[in-house]
Amino acid sequence: MTDAQMADFGAARYLRKSEKERLEAQTRPFDIRTECFVPDDKEEYVKAKIVSREGGKVTAETENGKTVTVKEDQVMQQNPPKFDKIEDMAMLTFLHEPAVLYNLKERYAAWMIYTYSGLFCVTVNPYKWLPVYNAEVVAAYRGKKRSEAPPHIFSISDNAYQYMLTDRENQSILITGESGAGKTVNTKRVIQYFASIAAIGDRSKKDNPNANKGTLEDQIIQANPALEAFGNAKTVRNDNSSRFGKFIRIHFGATGKLASADIETYLLEKSRVIFQLKAERNYHIFYQILSNKKPELLDMLLVTNNPYDYAFVSQGEVSVASIDDSEELLATDSAFDVLGFTAEEKAGVYKLTGAIMHYGNMKFKQKQREEQAEPDGTEDADKSAYLMGLNSADLLKGLCHPRVKVGNEYVTKGQSVQQVYYSIGALAKSVYEKMFNWMVTRINATLETKQPRQYFIGVLDIAGFEIFDFNSFEQLCINFTNEKLQQFFNHHMFVLEQEEYKKEGIEWEFIDFGMDLQACIDLIEKPMGIMSILEEECMFPKATDMTFKAKLYDNHLGKSNNFQKPRNVKGKQEAHFSLVHYAGTVDYNILGWLEKNKDPLNETVVGLYQKSSLKLMATLFSTYASADTGDSGKGKGGKKKGSSFQTVSALHRENLNKLMTNLRTTHPHFVRCIIPNERKAPGVMDNPLVMHQLRCNGVLEGIRICRKGFPNRILYGDFRQRYRILNPAAIPEGQFIDSGKGAEKLLGSLDIDHNQYKFGHTKVFFKAGLLGLLEEMRDERLSRIITRIQAQARGQLMRIEFKKMVERRDALLVIQWNIRAFMGVKNWPWMKLYFKIKPLLKSAETEKEMANMKEEFGRVKDALEKSEARRKELEEKMVSLLQEKNDLQLQVQAEQDNLADAEERCDQLIKNKIQLEAKVKEMTERLEDEEEMNAELTAKKRKLEDECSELKKDIDDLELTLAKVEKEKHATENKVKNLTEEMAGLDEIIAKLTKEKKALQEAHQQALDDLQAEEDKVNTLTKSKVKLEQQVDDLEGSLEQEKKVRMDLERAKRKLEGDLKLTQESIMDLENDKLQLEEKLKKKEFDISQQNSKIEDEQALALQLQKKLKENQARIEELEEELEAERTARAKVEKLRSDLTRELEEISERLEEAGGATSVQIEMNKKREAEFQKMRRDLEEATLQHEATAAALRKKHADSVAELGEQIDNLQRVKQKLEKEKSEFKLELDDVTSHMEQIIKAKANLEKVSRTLEDQANEYRVKLEEAQRSLNDFTTQRAKLQTENGELARQLEEKEALIWQLTRGKLSYTQQMEDLKRQLEEEGKAKNALAHALQSARHDCDLLREQYEEEMEAKAELQRVLSKANSEVAQWRTKYETDAIQRTEELEEAKKKLAQRLQDAEEAVEAVNAKCSSLEKTKHRLQNEIEDLMVDVERSNAAAAALDKKQRNFDKILAEWKQKYEESQSELESSQKEARSLSTELFKLKNAYEESLEHLETFKRENKNLQEEISDLTEQLGEGGKNVHELEKIRKQLEVEKLELQSALEEAEASLEHEEGKILRAQLEFNQIKAEIERKLAEKDEEMEQAKRNHLRVVDSLQTSLDAETRSRNEALRVKKKMEGDLNEMEIQLSQANRIASEAQKHLKNAQAHLKDTQLQLDDAVRANDDLKENIAIVERRNTLLQAELEELRAVVEQTERSRKLAEQELIETSERVQLLHSQNTSLINQKKKMDADLSQLQTEVEEAVQECRNAEEKAKKAITDAAMMAEELKKEQDTSAHLERMKKNMEQTIKDLQHRLDEAEQIALKGGKKQLQKLEARVRELENELEAEQKRNAESVKGMRKSERRIKELTYQTEEDKKNLVRLQDLVDKLQLKVKAYKRQAEEAEEQANTNLSKFRKVQHELDEAEERADIAESQVNKLRAKSRDIGAKQKMHDEE
C-alpha cells in the first residue's frame, strides 16, 4: 500500500512504515553471515557482529562496542533489513526469541503498537494517547481484508464482522494479558467499532420510545463505565485494573445490524472489598461516592467525604492522579440512566455500597471473663442496618450470637471477636459480589431487545497468566482458565494451519497440538484431581489445609509429571505444591483454601437479609438457602440447596466449561496485550519483562506452532513474477506456461534443498529460512544484472555521445561547403533575380491556402452547430436516463433486500426440509425395522407356543436329568474350588515376587551404594596421590598456585567487600527506617500530649458540671423523698405483677408441656385465668391510683421539676457529648498505644536485626582482616620467593652461560618455536584445568595448610640448594672480578687464560650439553615416566577390571532377577487368562452339554411317542378291521404323522448341513491362523539368520581391526626398542657430563614429571569415571530395550491370545467340530516339536554368537589396553617436547645474556688483538653448526612423535567403534535370548492348550459316540416304524382292492 493510499487512514505513521523507510531498509548493507543476536544478562539479547569462530565458540562484537565469546548454539542470525518492523512476525525468515523481541521493540519505538504474529495480534501498551482510534480510522478499516490494511484492533474486529456475515458463523475475540497491558482499553475499542459500524448501517431506524434510555449502541458503550466503577480498582501496575473477567456477546441480525448484547463475568476479586495493599485501593465506586460531587448521596448514605473515616476503603491509597473521581461519579450515574436503571434501583445500589463502608467501622470487644464478643458502640451498626433495611439490634445479635442447627434443634452460639470480624468481612464480600452480579443481570436485561438476532461476536477480556511470589487459590483458578484457553488457542491455530495444507493438497500427517496441555488440565479438573480433592475435603467437617495437602501428595506426587514438591527458599513465602503450567512452574500456598472454597456465611444474618425492607437486598439473597432449610424441602427446595452450597471451585469450573463451550461454537480471533515496562513510561521497553510475557501469553508458542509446517507461502503468479530472475531460462518468454508448472520448473532448476518446499493447488509453501535464502540469491542476481546494465548503459551513452560528435563534425563540413558555394554565387545576376522572385511565388500559395481555410472554417462551424444541438438533446436524454437509473437502482436495492431475506428464508426452509426429510427417512427406516421385528417376534411367538406345548410334555423327562446335572454341578464346583485354590497359590507367588522385587531393589540400591563407595575410594586415593606428589612440586608450580590462591583471595575479598557494602547499605536503610519511625513516634507522642491536654480541659469542665449536677441532685433528692412512698407502693404492685406474670408463664409452660389434655387442667386453667383477671384489675386500679397521686405531686412541683429537668437534660447532653469524645479519644489513644507497641516491637526487631547484622559485619571484618593478613603473608612470601627465584634463575643462567655461550640459531628455530608454543599453550591449558580442579577439591582448610607446609619445606630445600649455588657463583664472580682488577697490568696473560678456559669449557660443553639437552634428559624422563605410568596403568586397569567385573556381576544378577520377575509375571498373566478361558469354556461346554441333553430328550420323547403309537396301532390291528371307517381315519392320521416325520427329518438334515458349513468355515479360519503363525515363524527365522550374518560380519571386521592394531603395536614396540638402544648408547657417552651440568635442573624436571604424572592419573581417574558412567548408561539402555522388548512380546502374546480365544469360541460352538480340534491338536504337537527343534538350534547359534562376542570383547579390551599404553607413550613424548621447549627458552635467554657479556668482553679486550677474536668467532660458528644439527635431530623426533600420535588417535577411534559394535552385539544377543524364552513360553502354552483341548476332545468324543449310538437306535426304530407303516399301507391297499 502506497503512502497516498495510507493517507486515508489519517494516522498513517503510527500504523505502517513509509515508502522511504522501506526503500532505505532494502538498500541498507547487510551481511547475513556476520549479523547476529547474542544473549545478554540485562537486555536478554543484543545485536552483534561475528568476528571469529573457533572450536564451537563464537567471538562477536556487540552494537555497543563490547566483545563477547559465546557458544555457537547461543548465537542467532538476524533477519535481512527488508524484514525490519515487519507487520506479521510469522513471515520472518529466522524466527526465534530475539527476532520477535526486536521486531516488537522497533515497532514500539516507532509507535506502531499493533503487530500480527501468525493468526493473532500482539499489542503493546503505549502509555499515551495515539490518534489511531478516531472516526477516520474506523471508516478506513471498514470492509478491508487483513492483508489490505496495517495491523490494528479494528482490523481484527472488521475481519470478525465480515467472517460472521460471509461464513454465517459466530465469532469471538479473545483479549488476554497481564494487568495493565491494555485489555480493557482494547475491549472498549472493539465495542466502539461494532457500535460505530452498526450505527452506520442502521441510523435511519433508531427510534426508541424511551428517550432517557438512549439507543442500543449507547447502552452497549455505557455498560463499560457502570461495570468499571464497581469492578475496576487501582493496583500496583495499573490505575484502572479490571478485577474481573468478562465475555461480552454482541448479537447481530441476519443483515449485520446490531440486535442486542449480553455480558458474562468471571472471578470477581471479592477480597479487595475488605482488604487492599498499601499501593492499591478499593473499587472506584467508593471513592466516587466520597468525592462530594453529589452531596445528596452523602446525606442519603450517612457518610462523610473523608475516605480515612472508613476502614474498608482506606487501607491503601485513596486517590489516583490519573482518575477524577467526581467526574467518574457523574459518568457512572449517567450510565445508570442510559442503561434504564430506575431511581429505586440506583438508590438501592448506592445504599448497599454505603452500608459496606459502615460495616468496616463496626467495633466489637470481648466480654469480661468470657471469650464471647459484644458490640463496642452501635452507631455504625445502626447506620448500616438503616441502609440495608434491617433492625440494628437483630443485626448485632445475629453477628454476636448466631443460631446454629444441632441435630433437629437450633442453638444460640457465642462468637469470639475474631469470628465476628471474619463474619462481617464474609458478609460484606458476599453483598458486594451479589450486587455486582445483579447489576450484570440488570444490564443484560436492558441490552436484551425483541429484535431478531442471528449471530453474535463475543469479546473475552480476562486476566492473563499469574506467577507471583505468593500464589493462592485465586491464582490457581486464573492459571487454570488460561491453561484451558491456551489449549483452545493451540488447537485452533494449528488446526487452521493444517486445514490450509489439506485444502492445498499437501501431503501432511495431521497432528493434534491441542492435547499438549491436557495432562495439566486433567490434573486440575478430572476426578481425583486438585479441584475434586478440594471439594471432597470441603465436605468433611474435620478437614484442614494439611489434610488437603496430604491427599494431594498421596494421589499425585510421583504419579503426575505436572505435580511437584516445591523447594522452599528462605525469605520467600512457603509453598506447599508446584504445578508445571505451559508458562512455567508455579508454587502454590494452600493456606485458607478450604474456607475460600466453602465461602461460609452467617446464616442468621442472611436470614435477616432475606427479610430486609430494602427491595434490592431481599432480591439479592432470595435464592440463598441454608443447609438446614434444604434438608426438609423437596423438589425445588432440593435444587436450591445444591445451588447455594456449590463450592467456589465447582462454580468456576461450571462457568469455565460454559465459556469453553461458547468459544468452541465460534471462530476465534486472538489478541495478546503486552506491558512494555513497570514504570508506565511511554516508548520504553523492558526486554526481560516483555520476554516473560511473550512466554506466558503463548506468543512464542503460537509462532512455533504456526512455523512447524510451512510458514512462508506465495501464490504461484507472485512467485513466478518475483523470482523468475533467478533462472529466466527455466520459464521461456515466448511460450505460455502455467504459473504452477513454471514455479515448479524454476525451483527445480535452483541449487537449493528440494525437501524444504511443497507445491499446493494455488501456492508454493516454504520451510523456515528458505525464503530468506531465495531473497539473498535474488539480491545477488540483481546486483550482477544491475552492474551489467550500468556497464552497458555507460557504453551506450558514450557511443551516443561519439555519434553526436561525428554528426556535428559532418554537419560542420556541409555548412562550410555550402557557405563557400554561396560566397561563390551570391554576386551572380541570375541568383539576384531568383532572390527577388522567390517571395512572390510564396504569396500566391498563401492566398490559395487562406481560401481553403475559410471553406474549411465554414464547414466546421456548421458541424459544430449540429453537434451542439445534438449534445443538448443527448444531455436531456441523459438526465432522464439518470433519473430512471436511480429509480431502478432503488428498486434493485429493495429487490435485493427482499431477495436476501427470501434467500435466508429459503435456506432456512431448505435446511428444515432436509432435516425433516432425514427425520422422515429415519422414521420410515425405524418403521420398517419395527415391522420386521414385529414379524420376527410373531414368528418367534408361534414357534415358542409350539415349543411350549412340547415342553409341557417334556417336564417329566427333564426331572430325570436333574440328578445328572446336579452331579455335574458338584464336579464343576470341585473344579472351581481347585481353581480358587490355584488362584490363592498364585496370589502367594505374587506376594513372594513382590518381596523378591523389593529385595532386588534393595540389592540394586546396595550395589549403587557400593559403586559410590568405590568411587569415593578412588577419589580419596587420587587426593592422597595428589597430596604426595605435591610434596615434591617445583617452584614454578607453587608460584602459580599461590597466584591462584591470591586471585581467589582477592575475589573473596571483593565479594566480602561487596557483601559488606550491601550489609552497610541495608544497615543504613534500617537506620533511616528507624529514624523515620522515631520521628513518627515523636509526632504521635506530641499528638498524644495534645490529646491529653484536651482531655484534662474536658475533665475540668466535667468537674464543674458535676458540681452543678450535685447541687441539682440535692434538690432532686428532696423531691424524690416525697415520691419514695409512691415508689414503694408501685414497687409492691410491680413485684406482685411480676410474680403473677411469672406464675402465668409457668402455668402456660406447663400447659404447653401437658398439652391441656385433661378436663381438670382446663378447669384449673380457668380458675387461674379468673384469678389472673382479678389481679390484673387490682393492678390496673392500683396503677390508676398511683398515677393520680403522681400527677398531683407532679402538678405540685411542676415548675421546679421543669427547671431542674431542663438543666439535667442540658447536663446529660453535655455529659453524653463528653463521654462520646472521651470514648473516641480513648479509642484513638488505644490505637496510638497499639501503634506505639507495634513501633516499639518493630524497633526492637530492627535493633535485633541490626545487632545481628553488626555481628555479621564484625565477623566479616574479622574474616576480612584474617584474609587480608593471609593475603599479605602470601604477598610477602611471593615477593620473597620471586626474589629468590630471580636470583636462582640468574645464577642458573650464569651457570648455563658458561655452557651455551655464543649460540645463534634464531632463524632456523622459528618454525619449531611456533609448533612448540602451540603445544605449550595446550599443556598450559591442561595445567590450568588441573590447577582449577585441585583448587575446587581443596574444600578442607587443614588439607590446604598441610599442603602449604609441605610446599614450603620443598621450597626451603630448593632455597638451600640455590643459596649454596649462589654462594659458589658469588665466590667465582668475586674471584673473577678481583683477579680482573688486580691483574689489569697482566691483561694479555689474563686474556689468554680466559680464552684457554673458554675453549676448555666449550669443548666440555660440546661433549656434554649437545647430547645432554637433546637425548639424555629424554631417556631418563621416558624411563621414569614409563615405570611410574606402567604402575599407575596396572593399578587403574586392575581397579577398572574389578569395577567392570562387579558391574557385570551386578548386571547378571539384575538380568536374572528381571528375567525371574518377567517369567513369573508372564506365568501369572497366562494362568489368569487360562483360568478365565477355562471358565468360559466350562460355561460353553455346559451350555453345549445342556443342548445335547435337550436334543437327547427330544429324541427320547419322539421315540416314546412313536412306540406308544406303534403299540396303539398293534392293539388296533389285533382287534381286527372292525370298522373300515375307523381304519380310514387311522390311515389319514398315519399319513399326517408321516408327513410330520418327513419334515422333521428334513429339518434335521438342514441343521446338519448348517453345522457342517460352520465346521468348514472354522477349518478355513484355523488354516489361515496356522498359515499366519508359520509365516511369522519364517520371518523370525530370517531375522535370526540376518542377525547371525551381521554378527559374523562385525566379528570379521573386529578381527581385521585387531590384527591391524596388533601389527601397529608390534611396529611401535620395535621403534621403542630401537629408541631405547639409542638412548643406552647416549647414556654411556653422556653420563659423566650429566652429573656435572644438570645438578640444579633435576629438581625442576622431577617436579614437572610429577605434575604430568598427576595430570595423567587424574585423566585416568576421569576416564575411569566416564567409563563407569557409560557402563551405567549402557545398563539403563539395556533395561529400556528389555522393557520395550517385553512390551512387544506382551502385545504379541495378547494378540495371539485374542486369536486363540476366537478360534476356541468357534471351536466350541457345536459338538460336531470336536473332530477338527483333534486335527488341530495333532498339528500343534507337530509344530511344538518343530519349534523345540528350532529353539534348540537357535540356542546353539545364540551360544556360539555369545562366545564369539566374548572373544571379540576380550580382543577389544586388549586393543584398548594397547591403545592406552600408546597414548601414555605419546603423552611422554609430548612432555619431552615441552621440556625441550623450556630448555630452548632458557638457552635463548642465556644466549642473550652471553651475547651481552661477550660485547662487554669485546670492549674490554679491544686491545687484545684480532687473533683471539677470530678464534672466538670460529668457535661460535662451530657451535652454531652443532646447534643446527641438534635442531634437525629434534625436528625429526617431533615428526616421529606426531606420527605416533596420529596412529594412537586412529587406534583409539577404532577401539571406540569396536566397543560400540560389541554393545550392539550384546544387545542383539539379549534380544535373541528374550525371543527364545518367549518362543519357549509360547510352545509350552500351546502344549498346555493342546493337552486341555485333547482332554475336552476326548470327553466330547465320548459324549458324541453316546449320542450317535442313541441316534442309531432312534433311526433303526424310525426305519422299523416306516416299514410297519408301509406294511400297513400295503395291507390297507389290498383291503381296499378287495
From Swiss-Prot:
GO BP term, pick one: sarcomere organization
Q: Which domain of life is it from?
A: Eukaryota
Which is a Gene Ontology cellular component entry for this protein? Answer: cytoplasm
Report keywords, A-Z.
Answer: Actin-binding, ATP-binding, Calmodulin-binding, Coiled coil, Cytoplasm, Methylation, Motor protein, Muscle protein, Myosin, Nucleotide-binding, Phosphoprotein, Thick filament
Boundaries of every IQ domain copy = 782-811
Family annotation (PROSITE patterns): IQ, MYOSIN_MOTOR, SH3_LIKE
Q: Where is the Myosin N-terminal SH3-like domain?
A: 31-80
* Segments for region (Disordered): 1907-1938
Using the record's annotation, list all stretches that form the Myosin motor domain.
Answer: 84-779
In the record, Phosphotyrosine modifications are located at 1260, 1309
What more is known? The cardiac alpha isoform is a 'fast' ATPase myosin, while the beta isoform is a 'slow' ATPase.
List the protein's name: Myosin-6
Its lineage reads:
Eukaryota, Metazoa, Chordata, Craniata, Vertebrata
Which gene underlies this protein? Myh6
